[in-house]
Amino acid sequence: KVFGGGMRQAGFLAAAGIYALDHQVERLKEDHARAKALGEMLGKLHQVSEIFPVATNIVIARLEGTTPEEFMKKLSDQNIKSVKFGKDLVRFVTHLDFDDDQLEEFGKRIEKI
């Protein structure tokens, strides 16, 4: 492994990357559009003071009047996953398996927090 013996798995990783470039790049626009919509929904919450500009499939929300831990607990109670991203930030990510129906459901669930 010291001399590259652990690199034999690199071919599997490279194959996944090649597949993604060949088959997924065009549909990334869908993830980005859903992320933008998700950010707009989050921006309506009183706990969210700012949504960073959404240019990809990542949404970052700045919180006010609550901690990321408290906010994430409320999200978790609605089966919504997020990640703490700083002292007052929470991050969300859309992906291939997050579709329009789930986006709509997300909107309904965050109204409950």
Identify the role of each PLM range.
Residues 53, 79-94:
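Conserved PLP cofactor-binding pocket of PLP-dependent enzymes
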